[in-house]
Regions:
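Nucleotidyltransferase catalytic core that binds NTPs
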Residues: 1-192
Length: 192
């Protein structure tokens, strides 16, 4: 059981390309659910195999804007950005105190393909954010995951549909906090 008074670092990983209103709302909800925990955004670096990431410095700056709104318990970690070779979530989490990793149910779908699976599932705790069309319990009942079921906690949160890809496809500022939208305009980002 993930106790609310555990001293822990909650780590929210992702590309944050760009960070959206959904990322902010998820962070706020998780921080509210675990008021004694430190909260870290963990953006992936360029060594990660995701294409189309804007420069790390811009993603870090935009995440700092989210942290200003979230308050002093939140911070941005640049450990994966500093890594020249992506080593995976397993090794990143080892750098935090009693870590709990936040992931969307859409990312839970492929957890068996993560570097260092099953160790990452066996040795860590996770807060899973529901996503439309993803049956979290069915995933956690898979043979490869069911013995780690107690390490996964499903956060009761309303459906938030504001993905970074939706912003990149539409350039609609409704997906962003105003200060992030302003930063994007000032720095001429996501023009393609």
């Amino acid at each position: 059981m993930l106790e609310r008074d555990d001293i822990m670092d909650i780590v929210f990983g992702g590309s944050f390309n760009p960070p959206t209103v959904a990322h902010f709302r998820i962070a706020k909800k998780v921080m509210s659910a675990y008021p004694s925990a430190a909260f870290y955004f963990l953006p992936t670096g360029q060594a990660y195999w995701k294409e189309g990431l804007i420069e790390d410095r811009h993603r870090l700056s935009m995440l700092e804007l989210l942290c200003r709104r979230l308050g002093p318990r939140s911070a941005v970690s640049d450990i994966e950005i500093k890594d020249k070779k992506y080593a995976g979530t397993y090794y990143s989490l080892r750098k935090f105190n009693n870590p709990v990793f936040v992931l969307g149910a859409d990312n839970l779908v492929g957890i068996e393909t993560w570097i260092n699976f099953p160790a990452v599932a066996a040795e860590n705790r996770f807060v899973v954010i529901p996503r439309a069309g993803v049956d979290i319990e069915a995933i956690l009942a898979r043979d490869s995951l069911k013995k780690y079921r107690d390490n996964f906690f499903i956060l009761d949160v309303e459906e938030i549909s504001a993905s970074a890809s939706a912003y990149r496809n539409t350039k609609d500022d409704k997906y962003l906090l105003p200060e992030v939208a302003q930063y994007i305009k000032e720095n001429n980002l996501y023009k393609e």
